[in-house]
Amino acid sequence: MPRSLKKGPFVDEHLLNKVDAQNEKGTKQVIKTWSRRSTILPDFIGHTFAVHDGRKHVPVFIDDSMVGHKLGEFAPTKTFKGHVKDDMKGRR
């Protein structure tokens, strides 16, 4: 069930303050964050966020197709190493 429209999108206040400060200065430094739950707003376009995946910070460059999604969607937490080969040779 999606979030109610009357509430608006959720963004951590400290993250929004950092983006606004960089927009005023005109800088585009990497913003390190642990806030995977924050929604990407149109103000974030062109910025790079270092989103924590539980082990390290993954750089995520924001473009217009990402608006409305969560930051955590672009920093996977699990590494997929592939399926085990289903081979009868290994069972002998």
UniProtKB/Swiss-Prot annotation:
Gene Ontology terms describing biological process: ribosomal small subunit assembly; translation
GO MF annotation terms: rRNA binding; structural constituent of ribosome
Pfam families reported for this sequence: Ribosomal_S19 (PF00203)
Any coiled-coil regions, as ranges: none
Chloroplast recorded as keyword: no
Domain of life: Bacteria
InterPro entries given in the database record: Ribosomal_uS19 (IPR002222), Ribosomal_uS19_bac-type (IPR005732), Ribosomal_uS19_CS (IPR020934), Ribosomal_uS19_SF (IPR023575)
GO cellular component terms given for this protein: cytoplasm; small ribosomal subunit
Keywords per UniProt: Ribonucleoprotein, Ribosomal protein, RNA-binding, rRNA-binding
Function: Protein S19 forms a complex with S13 that binds strongly to the 16S ribosomal RNA.
Family indicated by similarity: Belongs to the universal ribosomal protein uS19 family.
Protein name, entry field: Small ribosomal subunit protein uS19
Name of the coding gene: rpsS
